[in-house]
Amino acid sequence: MAVSLSASARRRTAKLRRHVRVRKKVSGTPIRPRLVVTRSSRHIYAQVIDDVAGHTLASASTLEDGLRASDGDKSAKAREVGRLVAERARAAGIDAVVFDRGGRTYHGRIAALADAAREGGLNF
């Protein structure tokens, strides 16, 4: 007998499955750290992480004072976070990263952040 799930439970399960599938393949090294993108309904966060040492090398989010007060839609703020994290990673001597979309589909705010990080000089 099959158990039927609600629509939200199916989405949550699918996201978890995607996240596990991506994390099996993606790992950050000191030479090529992992750019992790985390998204909520209101904010977006980006961190550059060296998984070997377990350290965050650079980060940016919409919770920062300059971005929190800025006008614009959520995609514009995601682009600004991407630009900021690329700038901070480059200042830390990082040119190449592995992109970890955190189980989210590569669309909308996730894609906007990734494109802005590429324009900022990070190679994926």
From Swiss-Prot:
Name the keywords, alphabetized.
Answer: Ribonucleoprotein, Ribosomal protein, RNA-binding, rRNA-binding
One Gene Ontology biological process:
translation
Kindly list the GO CC terms recorded for this protein: cytosolic large ribosomal subunit
- Pfam family for this entry, one: Ribosomal_L18p
Q: Does the keyword RNA-binding apply?
A: yes
Q: Which family does it belong to?
A: Belongs to the universal ribosomal protein uL18 family.
Quaternary structure (record):
Part of the 50S ribosomal subunit; part of the 5S rRNA/L5/L18/L25 subcomplex. Contacts the 5S and 23S rRNAs.
Read off the HAMAP family from this record. Answer: Ribosomal_uL18_B
The protein in question is named Large ribosomal subunit protein uL18
- Gene designation: rplR
